[in-house]
Amino acid sequence: MRPIHRRPEKVAILVTAVLFAITIIFSVFKNGKGTSPIPVKERPLKAFITSAYYYSSSKSLGKNALALVMSINLVKSPNELAQHPNPPELVISAENDTTSIMVKTPYSRVTPHDVCQIITVFATVQLLPNVKSIKMVSGNELTEIPFSKPSSLKRDVVVCTSPLFVSEQWQNFLFAVHIYKKFDAHMNLYLVSSITSFYELMKEYEKEGYMTIQPWVSVKYPEVSKIIADSYDQIEFRNQAAAQTDCLLQFKESARFITFLDLDDVLIPKLAPTYAEEFQKLMVTKKRSSFIFYHKENYNVAATRYGSKFSLKNMFNSMECQNNRETGKIVVNPKHLNFTWIHYPPISPEELAKHEVTENVITHLKTIVWVDEEPDGENQKIIEPLYYDNSTDTILSRQQIKELETDLENMMMKPNIQKIFAQLPDIHYYTDLVVNCYNDRYYKYHYSGRISEITCPGPQLCEYHQHPNITCMRVNATYHSMKTLSPITYYYANDPHFTSEMGCYAH
């Protein structure tokens, strides 16, 4: 048995106060290995459009509104000689069948620190009815960009799951996805790469309506030097803030509530029978809240390494609270918020405030042990896992656990899924690589207070030695080279898809 203290899905987070300290005191980031100060007077700005949503009508953005999320190389390193134009506004052109307009709009910074060269920004502007074409304007040049309409399928709660990479943790997924379904939430999971059999399992759950897989493409600036815009080493945690903001915008008009969780963070309702009822109850008591904030409580858990023997009941039976808390995550009413960072928004509307929840916590599966043998599931008594506060309260009742187990068994009996369960990974090879890397390259500095030694954090810190017997599905897309424009050159990708031909990597 080997304990897993952190997984690829686990997002290493810098507390906001620490990040601002870094910004003020150190402003440190790495421009790439062996690079020199840029010997030019001006560094050109490169913006990759990760999201562009057009709303014919929005309760918070207005009519005919465009919402943009971009990754842009706005941060300058201390040893950099170049200046960049840093324009205060974006210029956007739009056309419909009868007319066209050109408008200017400011952008808001989402990333609250200068640790990475490339940061996330958000912008919104009202355009024309029935827009057919949207173009970004740079000087006298136009760049047409693809845009989408937000989801119109009404849902009470959407869980936005942080981007997964080289993911093997199928037990975490099953634990989370069945709980979300039971309490009336839909998982929208952002995926970079995963073990092939795990990907196939998620696809089957997607077909059954439990969740949606969202391909999360890498930011790339084709034919641009890393000195100018380093999209490999200089983006924070696989662009997680952009992913969460994308999810917020995608379900802005269709979901009552949206929450942002890692795969090993599972929020279980305690104050009401469903997520929506609990969130509504908390929001009503704090009418001026822009979001509610749940802390995370760490738990140990054991799970079989063999897919055909998997049991949710046995996972619940093994849960033990570590009595150790970590910074949590938020739940938002999407009408009140337009963008968010990893933990919470860098800014909140002045008339609104956050509400810190004291009546419930996120169950964080901090340490998972993969075991060879488990008790016989059919004869095993259900043990209700205790709530973290040493009271007699339990996280779930016996009846609720029984219902979750029945739901799992029904899925496992489906012929296609039954075959996949037999093929799920029984070792955590890439998990160990990333855990050791993160501990050596990030955590030892973070937890020892050696903040000045931290460079832009994320999976790019790690090496991914390929295993000859393990294959992965990895996201790819079509990227486009662009003519350099001033003040900003705009880039984008289209046709996102998964392929088995690119290996097991985080980018």
UniProtKB/Swiss-Prot annotation:
One Pfam family named in its UniProt record: Glyco_transf_92
Positions of transmembrane segments: 9-29
Subcellular location(s) of the protein: Membrane
Molecular-function annotations in GO: glycosyltransferase activity
Annotated keywords: Glycosyltransferase, Membrane, Transferase, Transmembrane, Transmembrane helix
Membrane topology of the entry: Single-pass membrane protein
Domain GT92: 155-444
Disulfide topology: none
Main enzyme class: transferase
Documented EC number(s): 2.4.1.-
Domain of life, per lineage: Eukaryota
GO cellular component: membrane
Protein family (similarity comment): Belongs to the glycosyltransferase 92 family.
PANTHER family for the chain: GLYCOSYLTRANSFERASE FAMILY 92 PROTEIN (PTHR21645), GLYCOSYLTRANSFERASE FAMILY 92 PROTEIN-RELATED (PTHR21645:SF17)
Protein name: Glycosyltransferase family 92 protein F49C12.5
Organism of origin: Caenorhabditis elegans
